[in-house]
C-alpha cells in the first residue's frame, strides 16, 4: 500500500472482535510514481491541501489576500473530502487517516486570524466541514490530527503555553466543524508531552482547554525527555498514544 504515507496502527472493538487498523498520514501519493510529474500533480492535487504564507499575504492588497485564503479554504475542505472518500474505498483495516494541519492557513496568525471569523467564512466552514465529517462516519474512516512540534502545552513559558493552546483550539475548531468532539475520543488530536513541566504541565493546561479539546486530545510519549512511564502519569486524565519509535 504505497499510495498514502504510512503512519500508525490502532485497535478498535467491532462485533466483539479486536481488529487492527493501519492508517496513513496527510498526503496522497499515487501508487505509480514513475509517471510524469505533471500527470502526478494533476492526479494528486484534488486530494491534497494547499497553503500560503504570511509573507505572501502581507505583500498583497487585502482584497487579493482574502480571495486567496477563500480559494484555499474551498480547495482544502474539498481535498479533505476527496481523501476520506478514497480511504473509505480501501479495506476496513486501512480506513484510518491523519488529516493535515494546514487546512485553514494562518488561522492563529495575529494579522490574518480575523478572516476565519468572518460570517461568510464561518458559514462555509460549518456547512462543508460537516459534509466531511458525515462522509467519514458513513464510511467508518477513523480520523486524527497532530498539531506541530511548536505546540508545547507543558512549557514553562506562559506565552508559549498560550500560543500552544491557541494552536490546539484551532485544530479543535476544525474537529468541531466536522461534528466531532461531542463524545470522549470520537476523534484523536495528538500532541507530545514536550515541555519542561512534563505531565504536571499537561494536567494544568487541560483545565484551560475547551470541552471538545479535552474530549479529543491524546498525549504521546516524547522522543527527547518524557517517555512511556511519564505518559502513564496522565492515564487518569486523558487518552494516551504509544509511539514505539520514540
For each predicted feature, which ranges?
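Alpha/beta catalytic barrel-like cores
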Residues: 1-142, 151-162, 173, 177-180, ...
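A cross-family glycoside hydrolase active-site/sugar-binding cleft signature
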Residues: 25-27, 98-100, 144-148, 190-192, ...
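Structured loop/turn residues at beta-strand edges in well-structured enzyme cores
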Residues: 92, 184, 236
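Active-site groove signature of glycoside hydrolases
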Residues: 147-149, 153, 178-196
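Residues lining hydrophobic/aromatic ligand-binding pockets adjacent to catalytic sites
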Residues: 161-165, 186, 193-195, 220
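Hydrophobic, well-ordered secondary-structure segments
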Residues: 165-172, 202-206
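Acidic/histidine-rich catalytic cores of soluble enzymes
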Residues: 193-246
